[in-house]
Design a protein with these regions (language model features):
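N-terminal membrane-targeting hydrophobic helices
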Residues: 1-118
Length: 118
């Protein structure tokens, strides 16, 4: 949970859990889409770590006044959940190896409703 990740961050870098909760909430908010561990495919990878830096800046200042590198905090989160830092390709490879028919359909026409303005 984000709280447990925040407590882990405190053990590594000091401060209070509230210093880190926004970052860890951000990684895990994708649970709203899937409700299970598969949410990790959306942010728990090397690109997600870069996105975290873009969102939170290069450092997060903790309550002790220390600037903690966002990259290290994000890597901590991903490593705690995945055991290593996967790339997006690591997740996509699994999809490619088990592609569903709807994923392979090319050129299928979609129906678009015509907008009429009175």
């Amino acid at each position: 949970t984000p709280w447990k990740h925040s407590q882990s961050s405190v053990k590594k870098w000091g401060g209070e859990p509230k210093d880190y909760i926004a970052l860890h909430d951000w990684f895990d908010e994708t649970k709203a889409f899937t409700g299970d561990w598969t949410h990790r495919a959306l942010r728990h990878h090397s690109a997600g770590i870069q996105w975290a830096i873009e969102k939170f800046g290069h450092t997060i200042k903790n309550s002790k006044g220390h600037d903690i590198p966002t990259k290290m905090l994000a890597e901590q989160h991903v490593e705690e959940d995945c055991g290593f830092i996967p790339t997006p390709a690591d997740y996509l490879k699994q999809i490619k190896n088990n592609a569903q028919k709807w994923m392979l359909t090319v050129g299928k026409k979609t129906i678009t409703t015509k907008l009429e303005i009175a």
